[in-house]
């Protein structure tokens, strides 16, 4: 069957500052990573790329089932040359329709890459190929996790072995020869065997591993591709966040929202019997992670109330119960990442607040004759009564967090922050490769003032293309921090008067010790 399809290997090379001359896209109701708008005379055209081609492999890494932003990232990280294995559009659609194993196409027998004739690890009765790191949560049974740790001569790192059949580790998704990347959110790739053993022992009766399987690990080592923790699969975790969709009734949604004391964030309380909240599956003590697709983990009470109000007569909450919250905290992962790959019952995909563009040019920005003085910005923010006044967003699979919805007249606006600014440093620490939740934590722990080194989109692309490190010395000195007395909310279009005004179905009660709002 596979012999009727002939994938093509296209080797593209470009000059520094030049682009490859094509767009890499995902399109609605169309499968695969599509090649579009191949420019005449470009490296892409010279290499044989054609409009409608589907990309199967990048530098011999199979990418057909990977998330689009990861595929884009692989091309960008290839520098000035990249090898693409592509299949023309008609052949691709026929191959998908006849269920041809696309991974086998174009494989040369002499290659010693991933073995396509060997069954992938079997999980829950089906064949599962792991192409990304995965989180595995283990809770001891009978004083044992059901695995051992080993080191391999000539190889860096610690690996899983002696997996007990039907034991805790096996049930959690651990495979023999898995490479251990993290223990409870801490990277252990450079740790010794003894250090890793000690970390597992100190973890007590539960532990969270970030693992990658043997074949994928080998391939990433050969291709010198670094794993990004934010691309980890969450599918094996036993507890997951819940998306609760509600329509407002005559008496509101039927629950109270309270600021947590021991538990950070906003907590669901006092759900009315028969209310929209109860019928939708909301539970007492649920922690609110996101409102209508927007993270609220860093927001204060009134800001979250305002975001729910903005939804009108319906709202969507991403919530976690205490057990799920504790599990994600152990992994040092934000439950908000669940949004970014979650498939909903109707088949649609719940995207992150900053959705992947449908059209992405895979290139370094072309040189222009126009001279632009590209500079990063050093912005000093003094927290207002209710926050800094901006959203912090991230896209799964891409480095960096970026600014969205800067509130006019707020601390962020007055300090010079703008929508789409990429955060480079927080208080002098480079956070470009740090995951979203860690950047949030750095800003939260800054107290009443924070200094951000940011870069506008065009300037960021320019520095990346020229391979110029973005450092604070390139920026102009910051202005004096703005007056912190203004009541502006972090990550919310907030009116401090409206948040405390009683609506027909919403009441807000605030004191120095607690905040409690009926929804």
Curated annotation (Swiss-Prot):
Keywords (A to Z) from UniProt: Cell membrane, Membrane, Phosphoprotein, Repeat
Organism: Pongo abelii (Sumatran orangutan)
The keyword Zinc is assigned to this record: no
Family stated for the protein in its record: Belongs to the NHER family.
Protein name: Na(+)/H(+) exchange regulatory cofactor NHE-RF3
Keyword Membrane among UniProt keywords: yes
Quaternary structure, from the entry: Interacts with PDZK1IP1 and ABCC2. Binds to the C-terminal region of SLC26A3. Interacts (via PDZ domains 1 and 3) with SCARB1 (C-terminal domain). Forms a heterodimeric complex with NHERF1. Interacts with AKAP2, BCR, CFTR, SLCO1A1, SLC22A12, SLC22A4, SLC22A5, NHERF2 and SLC17A1. Component of a complex, composed of PDZK1, SYNGAP1, KLHL17 and NMDA receptors. Interacts (via PDZ1 domain) directly with KLHL17; the interaction is important for integrity of actin cytoskeleton structures in neurons. Interacts (via C-terminal PDZ domain) with SLC26A6 (via C-terminal domain).
An annotated GO BP: protein localization to plasma membrane
Pfam families assigned: PDZ
GO cellular component, one term: apical plasma membrane
Subcellular location: Membrane; Cell membrane
């Amino acid at each position: 069957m596979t012999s009727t399809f002939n994938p093509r290997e296209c080797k593209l090379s470009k000059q520094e500052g030049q682009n490859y001359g094509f767009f890499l896209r995902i399109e609605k109701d169309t499968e695969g990573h599509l090649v579009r708008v191949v420019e005449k005379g470009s490296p892409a055209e010279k290499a044989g790329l054609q409009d409608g081609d589907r990309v199967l492999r990048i530098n011999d890494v199979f990418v057909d089932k990977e998330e689009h932003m990861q595929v884009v990232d692989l091309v960008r990280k290839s520098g000035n040359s990249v090898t693409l294995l592509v299949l023309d559009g008609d052949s691709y659609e026929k191959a998908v329709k006849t269920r041809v194993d696309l991974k086998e196409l174009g494989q040369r027998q002499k290659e010693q890459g991933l073995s396509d004739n060997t069954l992938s690890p079997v999980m829950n009765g089906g064949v599962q190929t792991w192409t990304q790191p995965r989180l595995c949560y283990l809770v001891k049974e009978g004083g044992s996790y059901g695995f051992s740790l080993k080191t391999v001569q000539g190889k860096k790192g610690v690996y899983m072995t002696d997996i007990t059949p039907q034991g805790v580790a096996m049930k959690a998704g651990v495979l023999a020869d898995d490479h251990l990347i993290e223990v409870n959110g801490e990277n252990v790739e450079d740790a010794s065997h003894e250090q890793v053993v000690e970390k597992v022992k100190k973890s007590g009766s539960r532990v969270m591993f970030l693992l990658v399987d043997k074949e994928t690990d080998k391939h990433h080592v050969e291709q010198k591709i670094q794993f990004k923790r934010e691309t980890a699969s969450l599918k094996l975790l036993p507890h997951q966040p819940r998306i609760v969709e509600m329509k407002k009734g005559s008496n509101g949604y039927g629950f109270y929202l309270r600021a947590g004391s021991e538990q950070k964030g906003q907590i669901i309380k006092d759900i009315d019997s028969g209310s929209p909240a109860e019928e939708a599956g909301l539970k007492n003590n649920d922690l609110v992670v996101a409102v209508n697709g927007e993270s609220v983990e860093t927001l204060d009470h009134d800001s979250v109330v305002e975001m729910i109000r903005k939804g009108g007569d319906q709202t969507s909450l991403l919530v976690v119960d205490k057990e799920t919250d504790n599990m994600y905290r152990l992994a040092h992962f934000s439950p908000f990442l669940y949004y970014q790959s979650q498939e909903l019952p109707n088949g649609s995909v719940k995207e992150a607040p900053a959705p992947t563009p449908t059209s992405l040019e895979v290139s370094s920005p072309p040189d222009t004759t126009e001279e632009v003085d590209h500079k990063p910005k050093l912005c000093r923010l003094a927290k207002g009564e209710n926050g800094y006044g901006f959203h912090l967003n991230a896209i799964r699979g891409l480095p960096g967090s970026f600014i969205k919805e800067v509130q006019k007249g707020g601390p962020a606006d007055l300090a010079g922050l703008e929508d789409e600014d990429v955060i480079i440093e927080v208080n002098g620490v480079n956070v470009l490769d740090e995951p979203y939740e860690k950047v949030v934590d750095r800003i939260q722990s800054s107290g009443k003032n924070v200094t951000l080194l940011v870069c506008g989109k065009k300037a960021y692309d320019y520095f990346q293309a020229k391979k110029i490190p973005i450092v604070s010395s390139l920026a102009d000195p910051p202005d004096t921090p703005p007056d912190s007395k203004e009541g502006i909310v972090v990550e919310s279009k907030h009116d401090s008067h409206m948040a405390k005004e009683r609506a027909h179905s919403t009441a807000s009660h605030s004191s120095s010790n607690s905040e409690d709002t009926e929804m």
